[in-house]
């Protein structure tokens, strides 16, 4: 589908792998110019000359200002901001999560988005238009006990997006969320990653454990975990003028988890 994104300037955080990398690929296919921010943005930077890869730690307080300033220096505008960067550490219990761990997770998952929005919004307002798409999660609505701080951070993202949509809609800025369910990013397949953890938990081979997780544990109506491309396409839709009357929304890309809850 033509999302009418040719020459749009798109900033994507966490663009180096998983959903962020798939989103970069999707925007490039639509003709956009991408600024890819990540600790290691090399995979995104190798995709095309239309990608400006910025190696940056989005959890640092000045990272967002730097990324947006570089975007303005290179392109003179910012049309789309995709808040994607984040981590989802497994927690044995709420009681096992220290203050330091709470602060670290919230700083990366939530405050990075706060700072990125604050840096990008003045330019979008001056332009009279802009689109912000923030990646939340199905557990932002229905928390997972093993990802307690992650769940809270994504609930906060949902409210941040809605608040921005209300205040800045009159200025021509739209703000929406995409809430993925289980999505098979590299974190599932790296040694010692989520796939191996599931295999150890259920006493199965990794592929069988992932299938069991989807069908029997999370009970996805579609009975399989999603792919990063599934999420990326919805992000591109929400960033485009095809969705010009959509703001303050949360699109679930979860295989039916929320519907079945």
Task: Go through the PLM ranges and name each one.
Residues 117, 153, 161:
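Active-site helix of classical SDR
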Residues 122, 166-167, 244:
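Alpha-helical segment proximal to the catalytic Tyr-Lys
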Residues 92-94, 98-103, 216:
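Substrate-binding pocket helix/loop in short-chain dehydrogenase/reductase
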Residues 169, 174, 246-248:
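Short, small/polar-rich loop/turn modules that mediate ligand/substrate recognition or access, typified
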Residues 177, 200-242, 246, 255:
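C-terminal helical subdomain
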Residues 88-91, 142, 235-236, 247-261:
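Short C-terminal tail/terminal secondary-structure segment
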Residues 137:
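Residue(s) in the substrate-gating loop at a strand-loop-helix junction
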């Amino acid at each position: 589908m033509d999302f009418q994104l040719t020459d749009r300037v798109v900033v994507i955080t966490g663009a180096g792998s998983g959903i962020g990398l798939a989103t970069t690929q999707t925007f490039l296919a639509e003709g956009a110019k991408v600024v890819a921010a990540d600790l290691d943005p090399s995979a995104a930077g190798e995709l095309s000359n239309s990608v400006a890869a910025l190696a940056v730690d989005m959890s640092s307080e000045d990272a967002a200002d730097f990324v947006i300033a570089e975007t303005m220096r290179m392109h003179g505008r910012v049309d789309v901001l995709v808040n994607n960067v984040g981590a989802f550490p497994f927690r044995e219990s709420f009681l096992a999560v220290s203050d330091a761990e709470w602060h670290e997770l919230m700083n990366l998952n939530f405050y990075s988005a706060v700072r990125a929005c604050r840096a990008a919004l003045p330019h979008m307002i001056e332009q009279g238009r802009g689109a912000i798409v923030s990646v939340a999660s199905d557990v932002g609505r229905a928390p997972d006990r093993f990802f307690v701080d992650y769940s809270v951070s994504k609930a906060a993202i949902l409210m941040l997006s809605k608040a921005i949509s209300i205040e800045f809609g009159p200025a021509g800025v739209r703000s929406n969320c995409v809430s993925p369910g289980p999505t098979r990013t590299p974190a599932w397949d790296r040694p010692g990653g989520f796939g191996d953890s599931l295999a150890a938990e259920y006493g199965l081979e990794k592929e069988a454990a992932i299938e069991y997780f989807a069908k029997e544990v999370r009970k996805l109506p579609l009975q399989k975990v999603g792919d990063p491309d599934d999420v990326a396409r919805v992000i591109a839709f929400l960033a485009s003028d095809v969705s010009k009357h959509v703001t303050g929304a949360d699109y679930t890309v979860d295989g039916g988890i929320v519907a079945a809850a």
